[in-house]
Structure formats: structure tokens, C-alpha cells
Amino acid sequence: MMRAATAATAATVAALLAHETSCAGAADGQDELSGKPDMFGGILIEARTLPKSGKAFDEQLGERLSQWKAAGKKGVWLKLKPEHATLLATAYAHGFEIHHANKQHIVLVKWLPETPSTIPQPASHYVGVGIAVIDKNNRILVVQEKFGPASRRGRDFWKMPTGLVDNGEDLETAAVREVFEETGVRVAFEGVLAFRQQHQSGVEQKTDLFFLCKARPLSSDITLQEAEIANAVWMPLSEYLSKPLWPEFSAYWWMSRLAAEAHVEAGGDLPGGRLGSRPTAFVPNLLPLGSRPGANYIYSAATCPPPQGDHAKARARWEQAQAELKAAQQQAPTSKL
């Protein structure tokens, strides 16, 4: 899951860009260069601590890199504004590479481990895949990640294999690759069930497109990608759906249900060739995230009805999402043709 890791690692860059590189009222440059940990085992160098002196920066950066490497840290991120331009050559000398740049800053990164880098490439859009692999015994292939937000959800948090699509890579190829990289299971791609659109994500707060795919297992033995995956199992579908992984009627709850129901309706593998059902347009379902404020559009051939019955909290979240959408539409400027 080297590339899958980049989906999570991209959030590191987002955190870097969101972090203020200078503090109001603070002096430009402190006595000691320092950094703060990110959620993926890396370091964000705090620009407010950059020494004014190039010599001091050279000495302190070398010391910190040695310390961080010994501590098992991964990517080290450094953002330089124009006033820090004199430090650029020193950063190069210590092995930093430019990740991306704009008019306000240059972002550099250095990968410390001896293993292949999982640092994401700069992007205009992110395209990711999640793969629902369900076998004839109604078991779904799920994983636990070692790093990233999912790893912080607890020991009983399981998810489908996921990851970023490489530049020039088809969705089908990416889905097959991600499952094999994370679990060692070979699969046959069967199609796209839905896709989610999320804005202000990743490196430059770009739009993220996440495609929920369906795949059929061609093997069952699991071989973990130990660098990124803590565990992987074939879990009974009923057990997976019964776990309180996501609030009911939230975006990710809906995608899990969609994958399960698509498998059941397909009736498993059928002999011979056949046409699919009558083509149906993917329609947008605006659903609350559930785990934090906000909502996403989930595009699928099925619609998610408003929560009914005893789902008062889910109904409230759903209504809030619809209200926020309506307010945004009213505030949007009218196009002039």
C-alpha cells in the first residue's frame, strides 16, 4: 500500500499548509529550530523557529534531522517564504527536495527512512479508490491501518482497502493494485458502485474524488503489507455491518451499505455472460459525514432516503446538511450568460 499510504500522507501536507508559519507579535526566528509531529509519523518544521543566520540553520537542521531519523520519523516538511529564500540552498544540501511552490511559499520535503518514500505528488485533484471485496461466503475483506486518521479510531475500527490512483492509472488498475498491495489478495475488478466528491482536501485544498469499487476475489490467503497495514481479515458481512464504525445515514455508512446490498442483489457469481440491469444515472445523495461537521455528495444509482422512525439524531444531521446546501445555493452568485 505504498501509494495507498499517500492518500493519508497527503493530509500531512494539508496540515502543513494550514499551519501558520509565523506568529503575530513573535520575533522572526528563534534560538532553536524545532518541529511538531504530524499524524503520520512525520515532522512539520515550524517556520517561526527558523534561525536568521544561515550558519545556525545549517548546524541546527543537521542535528534535528539526525535526531528525527533516530526517532523513526518519516517525512520532514519545510515551508519557506520569500524572506527565507537564503536558506533554500542549505536545505538542498541536507537532502530536501521541492514538493511544490506558489507565489507565497516553497514547500520542501525530505524522506528520512531507508524505505521507498510514500510522499504524495502535487495534485490539482485527488482521485482515490475504496474496494469492496466480498466472497461467495458473504465475507468482506477489511483492514486496519497503522498510520493516519483511521488508525486512531480504535482497535475495532475496520475499513475497506483504499488508496490514491497514480497519475495515468485507470481506476480498475488502481483498485486491483491497492487490494494486492495491502492484503496480498488478487481480485477481478467488477465496477464502480458510487463516488464521493469532497472539496478543500489534501495538499492545496483541492477537490477529492473517491470511487467506491466492487471486486471479486481470485485468491483468499492474506499477506499483510507490514509497513502500512496492522491487520487484515475476511469478516462476515453481517458482522461488519453491525459494527458501529460510522453513524447511521452518514456518508461512509451509506457506502458500506451500498457495497453490501450490491453484492446480495448480484446473487454471487453467475455462469455465462449476461447484461447488467437497465442503466441508471448516478444521482447525488448529500449526507452528513457523521464523524465530524460537514457533508459530502455520494453519487450512486441508489438514493438514500431521509432517516425515519427512531433515527432522530441521524434525521437531525441529515436536515442540517440539506439546510447548509440550501443556504449555500442561495448565496451563490447567479451566472450571467
Question: At which residue positions do the language-model features occur?
Answer:
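Conserved donor-binding loop and adjoining core beta-sheet/short helix segment
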Residues: A27-E63
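Unchanged
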Residues: V129, I134-K136, K146, G163-P305
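Acidic, metal-coordinating catalytic segment for phosphate/diphosphate chemistry
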Residues: L87-G130
